[in-house]
Amino acid sequence: MGRLPVLLLWLAWWLSQAGIACGAGSVRLAGGLTLGGLFPVHARGAAGRACGALKKEQGVHRLEAMLYALDRVNADPELLPGVRLGARLLDTCSRDTYALEQALSFVQALIRGRGDGDEASVRCPGGVPPLRSAPPERVVAVVGASASSVSIMVANVLRLFAIPQISYASTAPELSDSTRYDFFSRVVPPDSYQAQAMVDIVRALGWNYVSTLASEGNYGESGVEAFVQISREAGGVCIAQSIKIPREPKPGEFHKVIRRLMETPNARGIIIFANEDDIRRVLEATRQANLTGHFLWVGSDSWGSKISPILNLEEEAVGAITILPKRASIDGFDQYFMTRSLENNRRNIWFAEFWEENFNCKLTSSGGQSDDSTRKCTGEERIGQDSAYEQEGKVQFVIDAVYAIAHALHSMHQALCPGHTGLCPAMEPTDGRTLLHYIRAVRFNGSAGTPVMFNENGDAPGRYDIFQYQATNGSASSGGYQAVGQWAEALRLDMEVLRWSGDPHEVPPSQCSLPCGPGERKKMVKGVPCCWHCEACDGYRFQVDEFTCEACPGDMRPTPNHTGCRPTPVVRLTWSSPWAALPLLLAVLGIMATTTIMATFMRHNDTPIVRASGRELSYVLLTGIFLIYAITFLMVAEPCAAICAARRLLLGLGTTLSYSALLTKTNRIYRIFEQGKRSVTPPPFISPTSQLVITFGLTSLQVVGVIAWLGAQPPHSVIDYEEQRTVDPEQARGVLKCDMSDLSLIGCLGYSLLLMVTCTVYAIKARGVPETFNEAKPIGFTMYTTCIIWLAFVPIFFGTAQSAEKIYIQTTTLTVSLSLSASVSLGMLYVPKTYVILFHPEQNVQKRKRSLKKTSTMAAPPQNENAEDAK
């Protein structure tokens, strides 16, 4: 409380020195209650000058709107009957410090009322007495200002004197702080709503990476701050750069701004909270940098649907989306303003200057000399006929601000002066705090038919129209602003109406990273949530969502674009497969040959050749060869439990039986001749019965092992998805097979291969047997060839383990190897004998037998020969 008198005395002294009462320009209207008005009639002046060029729309249109509204209020018998509203309208020159000086005139009467009342102390600069000595009006409320920085400066003074203030254009969120600006209200929504609308627009366009551009000051900085805060809370939008345009930009400043924006070229969307001059100079710098069409502007209400910021810069503005508080053109004001002339509008002291500017003429010549460069005004010119005219966008809000004060005064008058016409003592003077209470309580339909009301912070509800500047027939200069949507707590944006450079119907991107393709996940860049790298879901992984890749289940493989999983195809070797053709052909031919030979031997069972071959072991060997050929059919058949059991049992049985018989034969021959070198006593176990016992004894080990395996692990078919899980998922197959691994399969053959190797060793040892003993050498050749076949089999079988055709190659290799080994035994041991039996029966005589017998006698005692003869 102690600081207020000091401040008041300081203000009184400043007023006496400032010359405010000394002819400073203002519009005055007499009335019982005076309203103040602050309008940017002139632009900010250059260095050393307070004011610059006249602002026809933002300045004169808005000022005339207040005069129009006052005329309407004063002419309304139902509103404030008996009370006439006066006015004191001042020019802020678009500068906050100058506006503060002007606004001090609103509190002049209050200061002098609290001071010593010595009006003689008021002097103009140089000691000249004031032109008017009438006491200043007592202002009850103020309409204005326009710029947020000006409103903030003025509000700090008006609140000290409890003078309510209603702005028609100030939207800075800072002004919503009722603890600091408790006497401030506005009929336009704050930028926090506007910022929310702009965030919604950015999200609707699919942008996630934008830059912000703000004019230094409360409006620009607060607007951007609100946008950044809301976008952070909403998520999904990142700020590439936040650039501030200095209040007094240096030469080249705007080129520097453009260069900075191009440091993040993917952030094409530019959120701009800037005054008209800055908007224009940014567009000019864009043109000079040859970047027309690169930036995608989203402008605040300071841009709105105005022509002045983009005049002659339409190419750079094409596609710009702008926001404007929802408004309507007031027809009554158009009729009022278009009938204004120099004769009927003398109350507006700036109207003559407007007339010259609007019609490009001069009312008087400088220095009394005629000026040939500019025509002279006739005074008969008409607005809208001899000059272009379009109602300025804030006219509606100026009118609504005046009516809000009028309605509040009316309600206050009804409460304090019931039944009284004109002002009563309770309203002389008018208490500002009481008036503020009634202002915050007003609710009426404004000049455009929309509700006018205030919340507890003095803010109006957020309602915006959304525009886009579009070219017409490919020409930007003949284009215009097209309404594309609305915002009232939620966005309604008509995407079909939007038009863009390049492809008119495709929204240009403003993203840090391009969208990932199908089957790719986003790998976020640390610290920049809107930037990412695209990582392919390779191998057997598929895209779960935009951030995650997961492996497909074991029985599935990814789709070609890796966006999902699909069943892995199941394959097996079928009867019709080309891979089965050769094995089946060999097996059929082998079985036919084996059957023919066995039948031939059985038919000629007692002939010398058959007897000399060892009939018992020959039949065992032929049976083993038959089983080897037969296994091919089991390997091609569709796997099931029975087939799998038969495979286990017969896969090694045929080879074991064959090689057991050959081993027994080879061992017998070797032992006979080795024994013959040392003694005439025959070796043991060389009789046919002994040979059969040895053969079946060796074979029984294989049978017992397989039976034990069947009991321990019952056979069944499985689909093996790992066997054909190739690097390329497109080549992956599930293999329907018996539950036998490659090693298990080789294990089935392992014992028979051991017998084969042992037999080969004996065949090598018996290679010195006399040539007349014809069984040893064919057996030797058979075993050598068989070893070569199986040596070739192993690398082929295991070398194709990762092949996409593994199931076919391995099965074919195995069956062909078995058939070839059986064919070698059949061809070398029995085909020659069968040939002799069938085609040269004259050789199948005792002589042949004698030859064999003679050979045997060389290595065996006479009694063994007799035994052979007994056979």
Swiss-Prot record:
Gene Ontology annotations for the cellular component aspect, listed alphabetically: cell tip; dendrite; endoplasmic reticulum membrane; Golgi membrane; new growing cell tip; plasma membrane
Residues carrying covalently attached carbohydrate according to the record: N290, N445, N473, N561
Membrane topology according to the record: Multi-pass membrane protein
Stretches the record annotates as Disordered: 850-871
Keywords: Cell membrane, Cell projection, Disulfide bond, Endoplasmic reticulum, G-protein coupled receptor, Glycoprotein, Golgi apparatus, Membrane, Receptor, Sensory transduction, Signal, Transducer, Transmembrane, Transmembrane helix, Vision
Domain of life: Eukaryota
Binding annotation for L-glutamate: S148, A169, S170, T171, Y219, D301, K394
SS bond list: C51-C93, C238-C530, C361-C377, C417-C424, C512-C531, C516-C534, C537-C549, C552-C565
Residue numbers on the Extracellular membrane side: 24-579, 638-648, 713-742, 801-813
Localization: Cell membrane; Endoplasmic reticulum membrane; Golgi apparatus membrane; Cell projection, Dendrite
Function: G-protein coupled receptor for glutamate. Ligand binding causes a conformation change that triggers signaling via guanine nucleotide-binding proteins (G proteins) and modulates the activity of down-stream effectors, such as adenylate cyclase. Signaling inhibits adenylate cyclase activity. Signaling stimulates TRPM1 channel activity and Ca(2+) uptake. Required for normal vision.
Transmembrane segments: 580-602, 617-637, 649-667, 692-712, 743-764, 778-800, 814-839
Residues in the signal sequence: 1-23
UniProt-listed GO biological process terms: adenylate cyclase-inhibiting G protein-coupled glutamate receptor signaling pathway; chemical synaptic transmission; detection of light stimulus involved in visual perception; G protein-coupled glutamate receptor signaling pathway; gene expression; locomotory behavior; positive regulation of calcium ion import across plasma membrane; regulation of synaptic transmission, glutamatergic
Location, primary (coarse class): membrane
The protein, known as: Metabotropic glutamate receptor 6
Free-text tissue specificity from the UniProt record: Restricted expression in the inner nuclear layer of the retina.
Positions on the Cytoplasmic side per record topology: 603-616, 668-691, 765-777, 840-871
One MF annotation (Gene Ontology) recorded for this entry: protein homodimerization activity
Assigned protein family: Belongs to the G-protein coupled receptor 3 family.
Subunit structure: Homodimer. Interacts with GPR179. Interacts with photoreceptor synaptic protein LRIT1 (via its N-terminal extracellular domain).
Classification via InterPro entries: ANF_lig-bd_rcpt (IPR001828), GPCR_3 (IPR000337), GPCR_3_9-Cys_dom (IPR011500), GPCR_3_9-Cys_sf (IPR038550), GPCR_3__mGluR6 (IPR000112), GPCR_3_C (IPR017978), GPCR_3_CS (IPR017979), GPCR_3_mtglu_rcpt (IPR000162)
